[in-house]
């Protein structure tokens, strides 16, 4: 397949998954999806030859290990066709329009940010809402192996009471629109192997770390 056809396949796979998503309103609006990407593309992203970070400090916050984080930016796109295809799919105007309609948001002027996460045993995240500069948050779960279906995101209510855990089957995912009540976490649990996921954000123009962006000079229009 050509680069363009890979991107279109990713786009159409996501749009189908979004249309068939499970829409949940409590404790805040979020969407659960399955079969998000074409299976071969999901497998290619899972198999990216990027070593999982080691020697990390687990503090409940990703920023503690900022120097080891991996983004689907211009450098990654030159090396890995699968990352380029995913970025093009989520920069596509049809994708943007569908997200805006489904989620009731306006992404004009935002920039696409995609992070490839490879979490190992000991990793956890404290309850947080996502910072305000993030206008959209989505996770694609790409884990395999024993127990990986239980490695999903934990959802909390505004009183920080646990409500449920997103299913974490391979190529499934979660969407929410960050707000003051969108508390979520990754509670401590055994991770046998590597917990792989992709975090997709559209971030506001004031985002400073431009190297993290898929297209730092091309905001959504």
Question: What positions do the PLM features span?
Answer:
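Catalytic core of non-heme Fe(II) oxygenases with the double-stranded beta-helix
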Residues: 78-91, 95-217
